[in-house]
Amino acid sequence: ADIILNAELVPGIGGGICQVSTTLYNAALLSDLEIVSRVNHSLPISYVPLGRDATVSYGAIDLKIRNNTDRHVLLKARVDKDTVTFKVFGDLPRDMAIGIETQVLETIEPGVIEQVDAKSPPGSRTTVQTGASGYLVAVWRVVKSGGVEIRRELISRDRYKPQPSIVKAGPSPQAVVIP
């Protein structure tokens, strides 16, 4: 699977492991566990909403969760072909509901990188890579009891870098002087 390296998706060892950390992160959020350490990806990913991802990188970036409750908690993981599932067992009050809300605070437009290619026809322009917007996102955990909101906790403010468009351009056409 692909990994993000220098703001680009490239094949690499460990690609896909972030789907496991992301699934665990969401299970922990929805179980009202404390997120001690978590880093979002540098680019938006497609398999969860913005702000709901958790990247890991061996020896550098880790997801750390703490049971900050006075209850026992059991985490159970299951992998079945291409599906990973985490179940969290514990004692939440019956009428308690936990939800996650995300809000895009800012959309960051991508720039354009123009690469002059002497082998291309003069004046030509070819898009090599289509750009993608970046985002600033806020994530809240919302806890309700009996349908009434009792706590709203800002979990994170995440920034996702925009990816610029890359355009290959031929040299400027020569000016023609008419006498």
Task: Name these PLM-found stretches.
Residues 1-179:
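Well-ordered beta-sheet/strand-loop patches within structured domains
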